[in-house]
Amino acid sequence: MAKKKKEKSFSSFLNNPFDFTLVITILLLLGIGLVMVLSASSPSALSESGNSYAYFSKQLLFAILGIIAMSFISKIDYRFYQKFYKHAWWISIILLALVMSPLGKEVNGTKRWIYLTETLSFQPSEIVKFLVIIFYAGMLVKDRDELPFYWKGLVKHILYLAPIIGLLLLEPHLSASMVIIGIVCVMMIVAGCKFKHFALTGLGVGIPGLAALIALEPYRLKRFVTFMDPWQDIKGDGWQVVQSLYAIGSGGLFGVGLGDSKQKYLYIPEPHNDFIFSILAEELGFVGCAVVLILFAVFIWRGVLIAMKAPDMFGSLIAIGITSLVAIQVIINVAVVTSSMPATGMQLPFFSYRRYGIVYLVV
């Protein structure tokens, strides 16, 4: 009898609707990411707290919490979220509005965090990314017949995004705005909106709007000028990008060796955050970077495959939304680190030190 129960339990485990390739890919990315956080953060952690494992231990704790939460969340039928898709929009607005309340705290010149206690803080924009995916998945399913039209399809549904983007720009948080806009555009095109409508709107409104946002904010304009020639201000705004390029260049084909980076010794500010990919390139070289990017490509491939095989449109859009979230962040982060686009403050999924952010992402 006990043997039959064990066999039934094992059979149930095998029949669990996990995509094992995806899960293994996530665990590999998490594992490599943790090793890189340990390596990249050790000098900063030692100088700040006297404990070279300070950042790593926190990242490890939250990664474990994320994996545990993932195992529980995976048991919930995704259709459950469809019932509450309208609430996701309101929760997003409330969370972003709370950043502007006394609960919000300014860090490095931007107000993006909610501090409940000294040890309990989080970035609402990280949660909002997922709430936007749920909201748009539900709304696009409901309005699927309107999507091929310009005003009822594109314009009407983009307008729902305006208050969210407006609140993000008040923080200011341009990188999160870019990611969310990118996710929504991908979801709407997959759902049935016409690409030519996006192209025309992007040329007529998107590009001029982005140019205005850069020109009207001095620090953004300075970042753009620095991007054009970082060596012009090598001791100022160009410092981080130039040091990143030094790290990537010195890595060569196979790297200088794990743990042997020189640029992490306070040359690159907070090397365990946005610029962790440059430390990866320095220590593990082109080969190490290629392995990581291939793993991200596998993640994206499995995400698209899940979207294609989803039993309904809502599931398909949820899958494509989450896949787009990771893909867009990877593309922007690597582009910034290699000086292919201006600095945006974009973190590398599964790698950058994020605490609660790593939990949200894994879940």
Annotate each predicted stretch with a short phrase:
Residues 10-26:
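N-terminal membrane topogenic signal
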Residues 39-42, 261, 352:
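Short linear Ser/Thr-Pro motifs
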Residues 226, 230-273, 277, 287-288:
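TM-adjacent membrane-interface loops and short helices in multi-pass inner/ER membrane proteins
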Residues 2-10, 331-363:
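A juxtamembrane structural motif centered on a specific transmembrane helix
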